[in-house]
Amino acid sequence: MVSETDHPLQRRYAVSPDKFRRQMQCLKVMGYTPISLDDLHGYFVNKYSNLPEKPIAITFDDGYIDNYENAFPVLKEYNFPAAIFMVSGFIGKFNMWDIANGYPEKPLMGWRELQEIVKGGVTIGSHTINHPWLTQLNSDEAKREVGESKKSLEDRLGMPINHFAYPYGDLNQPIVDMVKDAGYVTACSVRAGFNMKNTDPFILKRIGVFGEDSLWRFALKVTLGTNEGNLSDRVKYYIRRLADRIR
C-alpha cells in the first residue's frame, strides 16, 4: 500500500518516484506477478488455484495527482495492474482531511485522469466521500459515506465499483457489514500480513510501503508480510512456516 509517489516526502506513506520504480523492478526480479483485486476476489469466491505462483496486489489510497504523474507510467511500463481508492467528494480537489492534521495541501486526481488510468489497467475503488473515521460516525452517516461514494464513482465512470478501503484502517464489525451491504466484494484494511484462503475478503491485509524503506527492507517486508521488515519478523516468519509443516 502506497499513498503518495512524490518529492519531497511529507509523510510516512510517501515514496519517491525513483524508489517506486526500483520497487516495481524488485518485484519483477523476485518473481512476483501483480494481480488485480478482481483476480483476488475470484480466488476467494471460487477457491480456484490458478493464480500465479507469487501473486501480489498493488494498491494506493487517496488518489493523489502524483499517482497519475509518477506511478502510473511505471505501472504501464511493467504492465502491472493496480488499484487506487478514491475519496469521491474530493476528486479534482485537495486533501482536506490531511490538511486538518497538519499536512500540506496536495492536489488529487480529477475525472480525466481517472478515465485515463482505468483504460490503462488500473482498478478504481472507493475510499468514502470525505475520508472520515467511520467508527466515529453514527450509523446513517457511515452508511452514506460507504454507499454514496460507490454510487458517485459508478455514475461518473460508468463502471461498477467493487472494492473499498477503510480510511485510516478504521473498522469494526458494523462497518464491515455496511460495506458488504453496499455491494462491495472486497475491502482493504491496513493490517499487515498475507491474504490466504481463509482471510475475510472484507478485511484484506496490506503491507505498508514507507518512504524510509530501503530496497532491502521493501523486499523483506513483501517476503515476510510485515510492515517492519526487521530481524525479529524474519524469525517469526520461519517459526510460522515450521509450525505449518508440523500440523
Per-region residue spans from a language model:
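C-terminal active-site subregion of NodB/CE4 polysaccharide deacetylases
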Residues: 1-58, 66, 136-247
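Surface-exposed cleft-lining segments at the edges of enzyme active sites
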Residues: 93-105, 132-139
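Short beta-strand segments
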Residues: 86, 125-128, 163-168
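Acidic (Asp/Glu)-rich catalytic clusters
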Residues: 28, 73-80, 107-126, 180
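Alpha-helical scaffolding within the catalytic cores
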Residues: 41-44, 69-70, 99-120, 147-148
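A short, conserved beta-to-alpha structural element at the edge of catalytic cores
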Residues: 79-101
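Structural detector of well-ordered beta-strand residues that form the stable sheet scaffold
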Residues: 83-85, 125, 185-188
